[in-house]
Amino acid sequence: MISRIDHVSIAVKDYERALRFFSKLLGAVPGVGMEDPNMKYVWQIFSLGDLSRLELMHPTGSGSFLDGFLSKREGGVHHITLETPDIEKLRAFLEEEEIPYFGRADLGETWKELFIHPRDAFGVLIQVAEFHPDDWLGDSEKMPPGQRFSVAKSGDGCTVTVAHPGGGKVSIPLNASEARRLADEISSCLD
């Protein structure tokens, strides 16, 4: 029902300072971001390492839904986003188990979501969403469209890079012996 933790969302007052901290100091790579004028905030996804992601959010003016959260702090973890392959199946499960949810939204194939309030989730705001993870990542953090793997010469062997089902890509350096063994095992599967 839940595929994985997709990202941790951090709300901040000082976006430029947070951007410098996460991208310049910790190496987070910017991905997709957007401003929501109705809710008066901006969000942006960042990739850390090979599969970890975080989201930075900040208000764009007074009346933002983040005002209450940021009224007593400079920033902090706002919510955790979990990925599901089927939001309707999850919704039905929550109703069956009498777990309240709110904020259900359906943006078509791009994004479907609902939230579980912290009072019903042990103090944590949980966003559950159905989406295509690669849609939210920067190009350098994912395989090109239609490509699921690549192999490149490196040192005395090669580096195999594969698309990850949770979005992004993972690279595995292999020495010459490991590369030959992998090629032999793949070949034997095809015989």
Predicted features along the sequence, with ranges:
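Ordered, amphipathic secondary-structure segments that act as subunit-interaction surfaces
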Residues: 75-98
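Vicinal oxygen chelate
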Residues: 1, 30-78, 91-191, ...
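Short, solvent-exposed beta-strand edge segments and adjacent coil->beta transition regions
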Residues: 5-7, 75-77, 167-169
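Conserved active-site tyrosine of GNAT-family acetyltransferases
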Residues: 18-23, 94
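Short, structured motif recognition centered on aromatic/hydrophobic residues
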Residues: 5, 22, 51-57, 77-84, ...
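Short, extreme N-terminal leader segments that mark the start of a protein/domain
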Residues: 1-13, 21
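Short strand-coil-strand connectors
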Residues: 13, 47-50, 165-166
